[in-house]
């Protein structure tokens, strides 16, 4: 059974509310700005963002508050593959701790389920305990380590979550 639909952008909603929608090419500058503010290393360039926005094997969600992108999540798929990958999730510094990451995570999980994926996997920096707590709270389990995975030598912790319950 699929999760309830994630509400997408609602122009009638109250000011200050967070809206979620799929990103478009019109979000390119805001995505690059969020990326540069959120990550010290391994930032995606405008060219990479454009390629992902145009790709059939990627889906990008943005969280919007008062017409401003305050969060984004990038999900990758492979044809006829039942495992999706959360490539990136970022929330603006002033918006962290307000549930934006959880909203974005719910959207990518729902999208992966709709595409028939059974598992969602991700890597997270070993020095990012806040993100690790979010993933663990949402049912992800750690299943591996990639030493020196990031450009600056930091390790990556590998997490995954079953999206479709096992049938007995």
Question: What would you call each of these model-derived segments?
Answer:
Residues 2-94, 102-107, 111-115, 162-166:
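Acetyl-CoA-dependent GNAT
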Residues 2-7, 123, 136, 141-157:
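Conserved catalytic-core motifs of GNAT/GCN5-like acyltransferases
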Residues 30, 133-134:
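Well-formed, non-transmembrane alpha-helical positions, independent of function
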Residues 88-90, 121-123, 158-160:
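Short aromatic/hydrophobic contact patches that present stacked aromatics
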Residues 93-96, 122-132, 148-153:
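Conserved beta-strand-loop-alpha-helix junction that forms the acyl-donor binding cleft
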Residues 99:
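Glycine-rich phosphate-binding loop
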């Amino acid at each position: 059974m699929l999760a309830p639909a994630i509400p997408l952008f609602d122009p009638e909603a109250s000011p200050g509310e967070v809206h979620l929608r799929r990103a478009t090419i019109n979000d390119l500058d805001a995505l690059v700005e969020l990326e540069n503010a959120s990550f010290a290393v391994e930032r995606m360039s405008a060219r990479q963002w454009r390629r992902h926005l145009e790709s059939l094997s990627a889906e990008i969600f943005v969280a919007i508050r008062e017409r401003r992108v305050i969060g984004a999540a990038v999900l990758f798929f492979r044809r006829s593959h039942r495992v999706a990958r959360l490539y990136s999730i970022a929330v603006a510094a002033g918006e962290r701790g307000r549930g934006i990451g959880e909203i974005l995570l719910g959207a990518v999980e729902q999208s992966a389920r709709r595409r028939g994926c059974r598992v969602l996997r991700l890597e997270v920096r070993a020095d990012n305990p806040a993100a690790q707590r979010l993933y663990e709270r949402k049912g992800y389990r750690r299943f591996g380590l990639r030493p020196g995975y990031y450009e600056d030598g930091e390790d990556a912790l590998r997490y995954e979550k079953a999206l479709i319950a096992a049938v007995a």
